[in-house]
């Protein structure tokens, strides 16, 4: 049996490691470097270059040199307008999926990533002297299902069986904590890489690595800092020469390399000079770009990016149910954490010096290799418990999202609940699967829909439909629905969630906070309407069953109160629905008192309670609880 290698498939650079005995080893590539640029180039002669070879020729072959492909993984064309502007190569849409066009051929991001993974695979094979077929590959913690699936697909294209997809901050924590199994620590892993930002809070102890919460921004990384410098340099040159260098692919590539170099130099120097001779030429002769940039200027230009760093940190600590003071260590991961301002912000927020004991460029690959060792059995006494970043559920009566799996739930996990029908003789139900944090279905992301047919006709609330959500260790969701009476089952693996962008995720969370009062009001309105609907249903049922036993006067009053409630229900105004419900319940109580000569609970009130138990989402977590989903009535006639 061969080794399971660990690969950090990064936006800017990639790295591969493997367990040798009890120790993880980072493997240098053929050029002698321990990290490999995540770049692929296609030359005029048809040759394909990967890594350093691609980077060396990028200036003279800018439109055919692909970098930052990770930003396009598992994303539709609609989700990457800003990313498309940042690259000199052509991004086109095929079925609304982002594709790279080179000449007359298009490549999927998975294909390009597979070329990088092949390079890492070959690097490992050269080192080990044997074939490698299995790997653990890391992804940003905030990657959605489609992005994770795209990463798995890239591995398969590269000839690798992807044994596990794990989150980058979690992998870093594994590497950091491997020799600290006996200590009990609460660790925040701050991961700012080339294209993404993640923050995870973990609890380490006795070999258990438990993720308490995770947050992040998949549109924030070193590329964004580079882009701001590129725009600054281009604008400065335009002021002097009235020429926009961004329209020249070769000049733009030179600007990109100069911006990245300046950013790196400003991490150790207070100022740097960008000097690009012969950047372009006009009728008057060659033009040169010379611009001085101070660290203060850089920090001022990038202020908006620095501001975006702290909010995910606040949410991650809050969702972990911890105080910032309870965090024992802050581990920095990713090359962009070398920026002094980033380190300053982290220190100020957490109130302690960040831990820089790990190599930010290699630690994620090391963690992936350790996880490979765990899966292989070479590493024992280590248990990794990761989480899902967003809540998952289905739409129920009144357009409410009923959550089955809460955000930051440890995965793998399975949760099931029992729901029922919303109408008499309903023979088909539609399961509307949602992801997000808002109470109303319309405010959340639709992951998919599917139907369960063949339900025997029965009164509403009688059929029992068991809905199960199952998230595997890779974070991929499976949903099934089963009719308990017939045993008929329908299931689906959710991959449509790939259409969920980071912008949408951030919007969901921010909206959930800023619209909290509005959401609460909407939820109360729906709950009131659902209760009224259940009361109407149960009252009509009771009238049909025992109406002839009621005194005529009381029956008339009940019918009048019922009609008023129906009218109020049609208006949707809770201010009129609640008094109408109270009036109907009062009439039932009076009728019941006369019937039984006692102050016993009214049949209508009892019926309402019973129907409410079936007809709307209750807060109980029991699996056998019957809830009323917003299912679609299918006419079989």
From Swiss-Prot:
Residues 501-528, 621-637 have a biased composition (Basic and acidic residues). The modification Phosphothreonine is found at residue 196. PROSITE patterns: HSP70_1 (PS00297), HSP70_2 (PS00329), HSP70_3 (PS01036). Induction: By stress conditions e.g. heat shock. The keyword Phosphoprotein applies. The keyword Chaperone applies. GO terms for molecular function: ATP binding; ATP-dependent protein folding chaperone; unfolded protein binding. CDD domains: ASKHA_NBD_HSP70_DnaK-like (cd10234). InterPro entries: ATPase_NBD, Chaperone_DnaK, Heat_shock_70_CS, HSP70_C_sf, HSP70_peptide-bd_sf, Hsp_70_fam. Residues 484-528, 598-637 are annotated as: Disordered. Keywords: ATP-binding, Chaperone, Nucleotide-binding, Phosphoprotein, Stress response. It comes from the Bacteria. Residues 600-620 have a biased composition (Low complexity). Gene3D superfamilies: 1.20.1270.10, 3.30.420.40, Actin, Chain A, domain 4, Substrate Binding Domain Of DNAk, Chain A, domain 1. Belongs to the heat shock protein 70 family. PANTHER family: HEAT SHOCK PROTEIN 70KDA (PTHR19375). Acts as a chaperone. This is Chaperone protein DnaK. It comes from Chloroherpeton thalassium (strain ATCC 35110 / GB-78).
């Amino acid at each position: 049996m061969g080794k399971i290698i660990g690969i950090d498939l990064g936006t800017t650079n990639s790295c591969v490691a493997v367990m040798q005995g009890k120790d993880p080893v980072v493997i240098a590539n053929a050029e002698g470097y321990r990290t490999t640029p995540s770049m692929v180039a296609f030359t005029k002669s048809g040759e394909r270059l990967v890594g350093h070879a691609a980077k060396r020729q990028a200036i003279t072959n800018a439109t055919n040199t692909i970098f930052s492909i990770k930003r396009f993984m598992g994303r539709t064309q609609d989700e990457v307008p800003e990313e498309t502007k940042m690259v000199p190569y052509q991004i086109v849409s095929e079925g609304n999926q982002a594709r790279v066009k080179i000449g007359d051929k298009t490549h999927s991001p998975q294909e390009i990533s597979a070329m990088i993974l092949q390079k890492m695979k070959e690097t490992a094979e050269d080192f080990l002297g044997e074939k490698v077929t299995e790997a653990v590959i890391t992804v940003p913690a905030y990657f959605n299902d489609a992005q994770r699936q795209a990463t798995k697909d890239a591995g398969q294209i590269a000839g690798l069986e992807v044994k596990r997809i794990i989150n980058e901050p979690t992998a870093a924590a594994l590497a950091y904590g491997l020799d600290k199994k006996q200590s009990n620590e609460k660790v925040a892993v701050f991961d700012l890489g080339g294209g993404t930002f993640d923050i995870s809070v973990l609890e380490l102890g006795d070999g258990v690595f438990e993720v308490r919460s995770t947050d992040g921004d998949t549109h924030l990384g070193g590329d964004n800092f580079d882009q701001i410098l590129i725009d600054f340099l281009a604008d400065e040159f335009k002021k002097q020469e009235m020429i926009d260098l961004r329209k020249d692919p070769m000049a733009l590539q030179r600007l990109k390399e100069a911006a990245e170099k300046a950013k790196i130099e400003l991490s150790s120097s207070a100022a740097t000079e960008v000097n690009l001779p012969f950047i372009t030429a006009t009728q008057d002769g060659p033009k040169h770009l010379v611009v001085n940039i101070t660290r203060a200027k850089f920090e001022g230009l990038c202020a908006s990016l620095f501001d975006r760093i702290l909010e995910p940190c606040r949410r991650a600590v809050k969702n972990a149910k911890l105080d910032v003071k309870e965090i024992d260590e802050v581990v920095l991961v990713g090359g962009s954490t070398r920026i002094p301002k980033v380190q300053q912000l982290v220190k100020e927020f957490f109130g302690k010096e960040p831990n820089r004991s790990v190599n930010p460029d290699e630690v994620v690959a090391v963690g992936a290799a350790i996880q490979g060792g765990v899966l292989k059995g070479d590493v024992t006494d280590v248990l990794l418990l990761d989480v899902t970043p967003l809540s998952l559920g289905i739409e129920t009566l009144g357009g409410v999202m009923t959550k089955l799996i809460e955000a930051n739930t440890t995965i793998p996990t399975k949760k099931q609940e029992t729901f029922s029908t919303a109408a008499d003789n309903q023979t088909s139900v539609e399961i509307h699967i949602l992801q997000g944090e808002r109470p109303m279905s319309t405010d959340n992301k639709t992951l998919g829909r599917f139907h369960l047919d063949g339900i025997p006709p029965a009164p509403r609330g009688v059929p029992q439909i068991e809905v199960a959500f199952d998230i595997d260790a890779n974070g991929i969701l499976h949903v099934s629905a089963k009719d308990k009476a017939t045993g008929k089952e329908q299931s689906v693996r959710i991959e449509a969630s790939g259409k969920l962008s980071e912008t949408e995720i951030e919007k969901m969370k921010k909206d959930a906070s800023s619209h909290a009062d509005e959401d609460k009001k909407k939820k109360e309105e729906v709950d009131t309407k659902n209760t009224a609907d259940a009361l109407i249903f149960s009252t009509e049922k009771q009238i049909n069953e025992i109406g002839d036993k009621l005194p005529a006067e009381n029956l008339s009053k009940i019918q009048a109160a019922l009609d008023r409630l129906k009218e109020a229900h049609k208006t949707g105004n809770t201010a009129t629905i609640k008094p109408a419900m109270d009036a109907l319940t009062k009439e039932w109580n009076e009728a019941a008192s006369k019937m039984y000569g006692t102050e016993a609970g009214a049949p209508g009130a009892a019926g309402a309670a019973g129907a409410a138990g079936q007809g709307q989402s209750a807060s109980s977590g029991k699996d056998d609880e019957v809830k009323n989903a917003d299912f679609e009535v299918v006419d079989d006639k």
